[in-house]
Amino acid sequence: MAKVRVHELAKELGITSKDAVTKLQELGEFVRSASSTIEAPVVRKLRNAYPAAGASKSEAPAAAPKAPASPAATRPAPAPGPAAPKAPEPKAEAPAAASAPSAPAPAAPAPAAPAAAASAPSAPAPAAPSTGAKPGARPAPKAEAPAAPARSGGQGSAPRPGGPRPGNNPFATSQGMPRGRGGDNERPPRPGNNPFAPSQGMPRPGGSRTEGERPGGPRPAAGAGGPRPGAPRPGGTQGARPGAPRPAGAPGARPGAGGGNRPTPGMMPNRTERPAPAGAGRPGGGGRGPGRPGGAPGTGGAPGAGGGAPAGGGFGKGGRGRGGTQGAFGKGGAGRGKQRKSKRAKRQELEQMSAPSLGGVSVPRGDGNTVVRLRRGSSITDFADKIEANPAALVTVLFHLGEMATATQSLDEETFALLGEELGYKLQVVSPEDEERELLSGFDIDFDAELEAEGDEELEARPPVVTVMGHVDHGKTRLLDAIRNSDVVAGEHGGITQHIGAYQITTEHEGAERKITFIDTPGHEAFTAMRARGAKVTDIAILVVAADDGVMPQTVEALNHAQAANVPIVVAVNKIDKEGANPDKVRGQLTEYGLVPEEYGGDTMFVEVSARQNLNIDELLEAVLLTADAALDMRANPNKDARGIAIEANLDKGRGAVATVLVQSGTLHVGDTIVAGTAHGRVRAMFDDDGSVLTEAGPSRPVQVLGLSNVPRAGDTFFVTADERTARQIAEKREAADRNAALAKRRKRISLEDFDQAVAEGKIDTLNLILKGDVSGAVEALEDALLKIDVGEGVQLRVIHRGVGAITQNDVNLATVDSAVIIGFNVKPAERVAELADREGVDMRFYSVIYAAIDDIEMALKGMLKPEYEEVQLGTAEVREVFRSSKFGNIAGSIVRSGVIRRNSKARISRDGKIIGDNLTVETLKRFKDDATEVRTDFECGIGLGSYNDINEGDIIETFEMREKPRV
């Protein structure tokens, strides 16, 4: 089966595209929009979810032939006798039998309806009686109830179909006029009486017809029709007629459509000119209200004669008269009754009246306790769907609250809190953990229930996972190097660990071989997030403290991470062989943070080691195992699908995305389909820390995995899924959620107060960056450090793209479009990419140590700030005498008391210590009669301040200039 688009399948099932998309999301299938294509299994799943829709669709061709059939042929005519409360009438035969004797019975099933319609033309047309009476008509009523003129518009002698006339029923689903089965006497619909018909012309079914051919005789004048049976219609329904034939025509038929031209609005009878018979009642309702006795012809109720019918005549009490033709051409008839509003319309009006208005729009409000849950990075449209409001109205409300956003823009939690407080809602942004739990529940994945279902007999012992933490340059990597007997420090730049490594060693403990897994987390403050993730996956933390430096800020930070995760701590006092080492000082300092040594009566093990001299390494490993056995229950179930943590990932040139993962439970096999964060794929190969090929990895085993679609982030969880499609859908949903959350976090809030100023200044300056690195953890740490740089409100830093691997041509193209700077961390571009960057003028910078990158970007941000100016005083002058000049105004004859007075400099005048003139300019400066550029201390001069003339003797003129203030 080929792929099907969602909207095509929705049309086939008879549902809307939005309902189809929503149903697919409920079924756990991720589709982006109604234009997305879905596979055959998903199509079958959606078809099974709508069995009724599919059945009705398949039955539609069989039901289609029913449409041409007359209503009288599809249902038996009701007995008109019991429904006539005023005048009894005899039982009438079905019109179908009168018009088509060869047609099958009305009770024939649906498939026989086309055959009945086909045989109808073969029925002979009955001869028109000379009296104008219709066959099978009801007998004329008594004389005290004169009948109105009979209606015409078809073949005068042919009986009309007995079905309902939906053209007169405003609540009918179809406004068309059903066609009869009378062959040549077939009566077409009268669109002139149907205000909803596309054509208002009156068809002529029988060709041209002269006045003498009418069975009812000559037409009467307006309002002077012949008698009409005054008995009410049986049933009293809203315009629906039973299957009985209509009464016979009187000697004068109602003025209606016959021969001649087609009716137009100008041919309608004028209400003021038609003579009404004596004693006639007012016209009946225009098709809605109950018919009144009498009235002019064609105005809704049946026309009556002078005597009038009994009360409730016309079409009977509770019946509905036929609407006039005025409604078909414009304004309805004058006798139209008052329409009643439906309950739905009344409810909508009530909701609109009760909805408060803010900023000219009506929005539903909560009671102050209404809780609305939103995902991270939700938009106004998502919030509007929750409260059933118009997104445009919420945008207007937010605008009046001083915030600007579009309906589809991701908003942060503060903006939603402001909007919810105004509308009376308590908005709760779902945490990442709850969001992940809800996402997995859509795929029937529940890890919590799985853990509860495990029994003790299924659990087996596993090695402890140890994290080495501590301050920068305190010897963590060298200590791990001493444990592994390998050298990894030489590959680090500046002796700083740039990414996480995971290793497993084997040691002897109490005569048995025990395995220990080590995770080396960076100690630099920029890697706080990575160290926090390392503390979450570990069982025991080794806190490395240099004996000569003691406790440092990152030592305290690492200690707090371990304590927050309830991780037991073993303290390794390193560098005891160095001069100035004081292990007792370290013990005393850590006691202040709750780590009391066993020597002091506490429960924390302190081991003095020297990584350089390989001193007491075995004692440290023994302390780790003793702490693990005493404080932890290190067991896991290896007989299930694997779950764990992605410790580190990078992009290898020959192998693609390579992820270092730590299996926490279950067993990971080659060929398993896994999803790790936003990456997914099938495990093509596994390697241990020595490069050996593995086929499976049990709990607490770190391995390198090949086969992922992209590079996961450090700290992302991974687990095995049933198939690749499920893994891909989970990864795509995670990616969409992370993208919305990042957009909401990166959004720069602009209030209305400074919006005009920001526009006038050329908008907000933004430094766009593209970050590329060798490993994902380093890129993420660099991004976090850069986003923490605070240089004021005037500059915004924006990371438009981040990735792992070499700088590519796509990166240069993106930087060209967005005027971005490319930052390479331990990566270089290809030669062709570098030439493209030079040709496009893209700035690329390369770093191997994170300090230099942070410092350079911080300086660049400060250089982008608007220049700040400060006032610098140049000099002061005292006014000795004021000279009046018609050309230059008042000239202040002054003596310079301090500094220098320069021409065109800013000035202010103070009198008795109070400033009386500010923001002035020294427009003229003279020494005697000569112009001067500047005048120094103790020299006399003449100062002209332009049009400012409020100068008196004794005033002080102070001059100054605005100099750019250097940033620090």
UniProtKB/Swiss-Prot annotation:
Region (G1): 470-477
UniProt biased composition (Gly residues): 281-336
tr-type G domain location: 461-632
Compositional bias of kind Basic residues: 337-346
Localisation: Cytoplasm
Binding site for GTP: 470-477, 520-524, 574-577
Domain of life assignment: Bacteria
Cellular component GO terms, alphabetical: cytosol
Region of interest: G2: 495-499
Pfam families xref list: EF-G_D2, GTP_EFTU, IF-2, IF2_N
The family this protein is said to belong to: Belongs to the TRAFAC class translation factor GTPase superfamily. Classic translation factor GTPase family. IF-2 subfamily.
Biological role stated in the UniProt entry: One of the essential components for the initiation of protein synthesis. Protects formylmethionyl-tRNA from spontaneous hydrolysis and promotes its binding to the 30S ribosomal subunits. Also involved in the hydrolysis of GTP during the formation of the 70S ribosomal complex.
Name of the protein in question: Translation initiation factor IF-2
Organism: Arthrobacter sp. (strain FB24)
